[in-house]
Amino acid sequence: MRRIRVNDALVLIITFSLLIISSITLSIINNYSGPYKFVYGQPDQKNFNITHSQNIQNIPIKKIHVGDINIAYKVFGKGKPILLISGSGLVMDAWEPSLLKELSSNHTVIIFDNRGVGNTTIGIKPFSIQQSATDTVGFLDALKIQKADVLGFSMASFIAQEITLLHPEKVNRLILYGATCGGEGNIPQAPQVVKILSDLVNNRTQDPEKILSVTFPLEWVKSHPNRTIPESKEIVTSNTLKQQFNLNEAWLAPNWSGVCSQLSKISKPTLVITGTEDVAVPAANSLIIVEKIPGSWLVQIKGGGHGLMYQYPEQFSKIVKAFLETA
């Protein structure tokens, strides 16, 4: 591990050998008969326990009314609250179990389904990053949580940035994973990646190799064909996927300023984490963010894709925990 100073950001360059696991392509892989074998279940219990006796699937779902929706959520662990905001197409049970176990050892962990996802109702208000931020702040208020550590993954990193800029009093420490500040400052996806995502959302492809290539370096999929995939009973409808895809595209579009120019206002301790091989949100976007947020930390995992927390869960979890303990 090397530590170097770049524009007031602490940059940690970490090289790991990676494992592979996917939790966002379950419906495609369920019907897949190709050369890769994806095994469902929990063969290694030590990696999946949230506490000594309780698994995430068995934690009761609670619901609370926020604005025009009922938000489904789970709470576990003890300590200061940390809110995990899920990315596009992900239900709350998609969080890597090792991360949840690590965090719950000294935090009250809160996971939830975004608007229209899983067990959360869709409501009548239009989908947008701003509305998602409003939903999330309203959720914290409904739970009577004054301030929390906030971790946002992918699309949720956009939401987390909005919350921190508009409601800084609600955020203790900020973790942005697979992030970009959007707009004209965004480093765009390659055209072939845009096409794969568009084809997936519009049901024009069910090719698991193409889909996995957006989330993971494909060579790792091929070299780790028997990884266990966390299974969830929750669903994300095609309508919600399209809505989330559209709000992602709106955030990434070059015809607005994004929030890059506003990030210097953030004074919260901030960790930005990415994989060097992330093609869904190119890793260069993370460097832009840490150059804007004073004193922020950047962790780049060599060879990691957008789904790096599934590729190397224990190391990802330790990085997050170390930041929370020292920042």
Functional labels for PLM-detected ranges:
Residues 266, 272-274:
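Short beta-strand/loop motif that positions the catalytic acidic residue
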Residues 69-119:
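Conserved HGGG/HGGXW glycine-rich cap/lid loop of the alpha/beta-hydrolase fold
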Residues 277-281:
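Acidic catalytic loop of the alpha/beta-hydrolase fold
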Residues 206-257, 261-262:
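Conserved alpha/beta-hydrolase catalytic His-Asp/Glu region
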